[in-house]
Design a protein with these regions (language model features):
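Extended redox/cofactor-interaction regions of prokaryotic respiratory oxidoreductases
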Residues: 146-215, 220-227, 234, 250-254, ...
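Active-site phosphate/pyrophosphate-binding segments
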Residues: 256, 276-402
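Flexible, glycine/charged-enriched surface loops at secondary-structure junctions
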Residues: 129-133, 266-271, 318, 349-356, ...
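N-terminal export/assembly segments and adjacent metallocofactor-ligating motifs
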Residues: 1-263, 300, 395, 507, ...
Length: 748
């Protein structure tokens, strides 16, 4: 790549180093300013930050203005980084059970010895049972996932299970409907109307631009429709709120398609030139009237028509689709139907609509996941395919269902998993069915926890391997659009451990694949990823604030490019074989799924199980959006815990009165499957027939004397209350239902 395409973070290398405090300056230096990237949200790439360090100790983080996405903004989580880094719950040494007996006391061992022990076991099990006896659970899209996938491919196991609670569940159906490699994003800068559908930009990645974009768009007059059971922080930005019942997004989207097609509000030229299966879809959605959807969603038919018409008739309108749609057995069809709404109304790849990313002069990094090793035979050994085999591998490579892996441990079908590694994930806190998950962790032959902090799952583990925080990593590489950065280690390791990357690279070498793992040299692994850019890590480090390529001039309507996108499918065919929007989806049909989006009832609901609803009259669901926490962690951080010290059940004032509950009361929430005991928060920002809770409370906070919570009955874990089974899962992406019916009563 020509150097003229690069834009340094700020001036010359020496100049930026002095600004960063990395070069000597005259006089004593009390505080060293070190460019880094904040990963307190757990994102694959995070916000640019400056670590403030004195005498080797982190004092805090401040925003890095040179970072193109957060532009100097940081959230409460970033400001709590020192408390998290120095938490008494940090894991600082590898731990193994005394005498190898599960439940026996923990014994500290050297980190390298822990890797030796694990490698020895995996090699023995590969010889005796096959490589597929290893399964790894991990969140999707983490910085180490490429290394984790590389190890599985090198070892010969297809069994990667991502958490099934975010991103993939909507992204895969979009890919097979619209092409591209990820969903097109809402154009906040030019939209006149925004549908926030299951999305919370006020707390989800807010510093990375969502909240800023929403605020700026509202100032220039953009109208906002919020579509979800609660308004949350988006209420102050919204002009209208469609408060649908949890898990009914597919019904709403299908009825909006009914209006758009039935009233001929679609873009005729686009449909003629770029859509396949319009006649079949038009006939199919005739059954999904707004009156029908009203009975399921609880949204009046007139309002459904009004919003559908407004969206279709506004030239610059976009849909910002979020995690909220991903927790129902109809998740994939909800995503497909929303993708079709974007396309049919002429809002795809047009100003103010939904856009694919611009082009950059900075080439993408090289993939290191060894996807070339994926074969039909390897795919056939998936213990519990995340998607039908006809739709795999997808962008993330081969994947098993997170919950399916745990279930297979219990059933031993189609074969038993012998060793399970939980890498940066908490299956008890994050996955559905805490009781069955506990049974699986108790049964599996060998269970390994890899994390920076103590977890609830450690109680069932045989081996615990600590890893470094982002502040302690010697080797790190960040890519965000055209921006590349090699963050500098802010503080030395606080214990005996390496980074997540070190863990997978060193384990790969110990398993006998040193050539595939750069002979243990992590620096070389980053150099390989950087090859397309013409840079090396040594060169990148000369620019502590990173380097940026140019954003090329935006062009629109790039349909041929994205409709022809080819993923890692074994036959190398494009996601859209006809090069057009798949309204009638032949790939889904070939995989045994419905070629057209359809409605699937939630397993337990007002219309799905009316008899059950007579005994359990309220709908329970949960949400992940929080300005202080991230999923199931950070409750042990004092400054964050002060902001939300207890788990709270959101309940409407009228519903609370009918239950004899006042704001702040302790309440029992009971479903047919389990119970919670939490505090009530009375709010008008929720449907009357629905109660909602923030997912993820289990940690205590020693410094504040605040308790932890059980993940089972009587605790604060909504996953303990949901139904399980095939009827609660999406057939295309195995999204799990997070809806059930409950009673709420005041605890005296």
């Amino acid at each position: 790549m020509e150097s003229r395409t690069l834009r340094l973070g700020a001036g010359s290398a020496g100049e930026t180093s002095r600004r960063a405090g990395l070069l000597p300056t005259r006089g004593p230096v009390e505080i060293v300013r070190i460019p880094t990237v904040c990963r307190m949200c757990g994102q694959d790439t995070g916000c640019g930050a400056i670590a403030l360090v004195r005498d080797g100790r982190l004092l805090g983080l401040e925003g890095m203005k040179e970072a193109p996405h957060n532009r100097g903004s940081l959230c409460a989580r970033a400001h709590a980084a020192p408390e998290w880094l120095y938490s008494p719950q940090r894991l600082k040494s590898a731990l193994v059970r005394q005498g190898g007996r599960r439940g026996a006391p923990w014994v500290p061992i050297p980190w390298r010895e822990a890797l030796d022990l694990l490698a020895e076991r995996l090699l023995d099990e590969k010889k005796r049972y096959g490589a597929e006896s290893l399964a790894v659970l991990s969140p999707a899209r983490r910085s180490y996932c490429g290394y984790m996938m590389r190890l599985l491919m090198a070892h010969g196991s297809p069994n990667y299970g991502h958490s099934g609670i975010c991103y993939v569940q909507r992204s895969m159906p979009f890919t097979y409907t619209l092409g591209g490699h990820r969903p097109p994003v809402a154009d906040y800068a030019q939209a006149d109307l925004m549908l926030l559908w299951g999305r919370s930009p006020t707390c989800a990645s807010a510093p990375m631009g969502g909240l800023r974009a929403l605020t700026e768009a509202r100032r220039r007059g953009m109208r906002v429709v919020v579509i979800k059971p609660t308004q949350g922080g988006e209420g102050r930005f919204s002009d209208e709120w469609l408060a649908l019942r949890p898990g009914t997004d597919a019904a709403l989207a299908l009825s909006m398609l009914h209006v758009v097609i039935g009233e001929e509000l679609y873009d005729r030229d686009f449909v003629r030139d770029w859509c396949f299966g319009f006649e079949e879809l038009a006939e199919h959605v005739r059954q999904y009237t707004p009156q029908w959807a009203e009975g399921i969603t609880g949204v009046p038919a007139g309002r459904i028509r009004e919003v559908a018409r407004r969206y279709a008739s506004t030239p610059r309108a976009a849909i910002d689709l979020g995690n909220g749609i991903e927790h129902a057995p109809g998740c994939s069809d909800a995503a497909r139907a929303v993708a079709m709404l974007i396309a049919l109304t002429g809002h795809l790849e047009r100003p103010g609509g939904n856009l694919w990313p611009p082009r950059f002069s900075m080439p993408a990094l090289k993939n290191i996941e060894l996807k070339e090793r994926i074969t039909e035979e390897l795919a056939s050994r998936l213990v519990a395919p995340e998607m039908p085999l006809g739709l795999q591998p997808w962008e993330l490579g081969l994947a098993s269902s997170y919950k399916g892996i745990l279930d297979s441990i219990l059933t031993e079908k189609p074969y038993p998993i012998r060793t399970l590694i939980a890498a940066g994930t908490q299956p008890l806190a994050s996955g559905r069915g805490a009781k069955t998950t506990r049974a699986a962790l108790e049964k599996v032959g060998f269970f390994v926890v890899v994390d920076v902090m103590e977890t609830a799952e450690m109680e069932y583990a045989d081996l615990v391997v600590p890893v470094a925080t982002f502040l302690e990593c010697e080797h790190s590489l960040v890519s965000w659009g055209p921006w590349l950065m090699a963050p500098t280690r802010a503080v030395g390791p606080l214990g005996d451990y390496g980074s997540d990357t070190d863990f997978w690279v060193q384990l790969g070498c110990r398993l006998g694949y040193p050539g595939l793992f750069w002979n243990g040299d992590v620096e070389r692994s980053f150099d390989e990823q950087l090859e397309p850019t013409g840079l090396t890590m040594a060169e990148l480090r000369k620019h502590p604030f990173g380097v940026s390529g140019a954003v090329l001039p935006r062009t629109y309507e790039r349909y041929g490019e994205f409709f022809g996108a080819v993923g890692p499918r074994l036959d190398r065919s494009p996601y859209l074989p006809r090069g057009k929007v798949a309204l009638y989806n032949e790939a889904f049909e070939a995989a045994g799924l419905s070629p057209l989006p359809e409605w699937r009832e939630v397993p337990e609901g007002v219309t799905a199980t009316p008899d059950l609803a007579e005994r359990f009259p309220l709908i329970l669901s949960d949400h992940h959006g929080s300005v202080m926490y991230n999923s199931s962690w950070l409750r042990n951080v004092p400054s964050l815990r002060r902001m939300a010290p207890e788990p709270e059940l959101e309940i409407h004032p009228e519903t609370a009165r009918s239950c004899g509950v006042a704001d702040g009361d302790r309440v029992e929430v009971r479903s047919p499957h389990g119970t919670m005991e939490v505090r009530a928060r009375v709010t008008e920002d929720i449907r009357r027939d629905t109660v909602m809770i923030l997912h993820g409370f289990w940690q205590g906070c020693e410094e504040l004397g605040l308790p932890g919570y059980s993940l089972f009955d009587g605790g604060a874990n909504p996953n303990n209350l949901y139904p399980l089974g095939e009827h609660a899962r999406d057939p295309a992406v195995t999204a799990n239902s997070s809806q059930t019916l409950v009673t709420v009563r005041r605890i005296e």
